[in-house]
Amino acid sequence: MPCVLPQRITPKLCKIIKKYHPVYVNTHFNHPWECTPEAEKACAMLADAGCPVGNQAVLMKGVNDNPDVMLDLHRKLLKMRVRPYYIYQADLTKGTNHFRTPVSVGLEIMDKLRGHTSGLAIPYYVIDAPGGGGKIPILPQYVLGRNGNDIILRNYKYNIYTYPDVENSTQQENVVEQPYMRKRTNGRKAASPKVVPRELVPAEK
């Protein structure tokens, strides 16, 4: 409503909202051009009424499938006191296939948001799984593997770092189990652990 019908956010409505806290509002700003003065005023009124405001954008081909556009959008939202919450991968809805982008595009956007703006401006990138699977977060891979007791990490610049993990007698050298590679199936692993590429392991000094 603050995006497409900001005039509906009135002092009377905000007075009602104040009576029934907690009330949360999620908006649907998809492009920085939608962050108009009218929309900003509406969001400010909600925030002043004690209503936390979030945003759920949808990744759409030709609209916002660009890291610079998404960065601009989320910076403007923060200035409007709106917390970026989700970037949705476009749903499998009839008649909207021309808006869908590869998941790799969304991952690239998330990778380029990190390190270039406040963490408050970085939403979750999610797929609303078909068949009632719910919202599943899709993340760039920052944990590359393990070398003995060291976790091999990369940052947003793709620089490689090691972090000494807490010792665990069950860990295996050169192996790290990625969270997305496991599921609970009567205690059995669903997939093999990921082995650290040798070229990514920093040389010992």
Question: Where are each of the predicted segments found?
Answer:
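Conserved AdoMet/S-adenosylmethionine-binding subsite of the radical SAM
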Residues: 1-117
